[in-house]
Amino acid sequence: MKRRTFLVCTAALFCGALLAGGCTQKTSQPVLQQIEYSNLADSDTQALLSKLLQDAGVSDLRIQTFFDHVQKFNNAVDPAWLTTGFENAKPSDLKYDPYSMQDAWTEKYDTFPGWNCRITACGLFGDFITVTGKADLDSAEDTLFMDYETLDSDPESLCGDERQKFDVLFAPVKTTNTTDIPTHLKTIQQEWKKRGLSFVEDDKIRLVSVVLHDQFSETDNSLMIGHVGVMLPTSDAVYFVEKVAFQEPYRLLKFKNRTELSDYLMLKYDNSWGQDTAHTFIMENSDLMDGWRILENQENAS
């Protein structure tokens, strides 16, 4: 039995054909060994991301709000902790100590926690999400209390969206006690449909959600978006923009394909080995992300 931390920040038919394989994509592509990323501390990478967002139809208000947050965060921490342009690193390497970075943020902003992956992604992607229903606020408040602390202090973070949209997308989903990923995928899809959640499908911008299975008891299980970011595919690359955590940096990453993005996220967030919970899985909008796979030998890749 275990409980994960929640700060880590129509595929049903498809999965039916792959049920025996647990929906994983079979590929001989080597496991990701190196990432190319920027902390958006320079004008060139900011201009690149701004154009990608504009080309995808993200509003000027959402883009400006995002970069205002980036500037506030980057100005609060030691520049030596951030990249200069794009840099290469192992997927698990950091240029900073998370605790020192947290102290630097707190020194400048006191008790305001800042913005995390969910607030950042919803702020950027909000125009591509439609909500007509509601979520169970009791479960949401239990797990999203720090998110709500930020939204209470800075409601403009959602760029005019109602809190309801955030709740419906990120409130936990009750599920069954199983390690079967197709079952969990179908459960979250059905619950989102019940809540009236739908996505505007656009090839230039996609919401990428890292779904975690939490088991509090044999009869109390839930699915939670533990991390989320915005994918911006182009003809020659797959870009991914994220806020790593409340007091950790923004990142723009560049991958060759979705499988590399899957590896990056699974190396960071799939810690279900030897547990009673299902492996982490990754959704692209409301479906399983093409290229997602479970990594068999994570210790050799990170």
Regions found by a protein language model. Give the residues of each.
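N-terminal export leaders
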Residues: 3-7
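Bacterial signal peptide processing site
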Residues: 24-26
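Acidic/His-rich structured neighborhood in mature extracellular/periplasmic domains
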Residues: 48-215, 222-226, 233-248
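N-terminal accessory/interface modules of nucleic-acid-binding and processing proteins
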Residues: 29-39, 43, 219
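N-terminal secretory signal peptides
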Residues: 1, 11-17
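Low-complexity, Gly/Ser/Thr/Pro-rich intrinsically disordered linker/tail segments
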Residues: 240-243, 247, 256-302
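C-terminal motif of bacterial Sec signal peptides marking the signal peptidase cleavage site
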Residues: 19-22
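An anionic, turn-rich surface loop/hairpin at beta-sheet edges
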Residues: 253
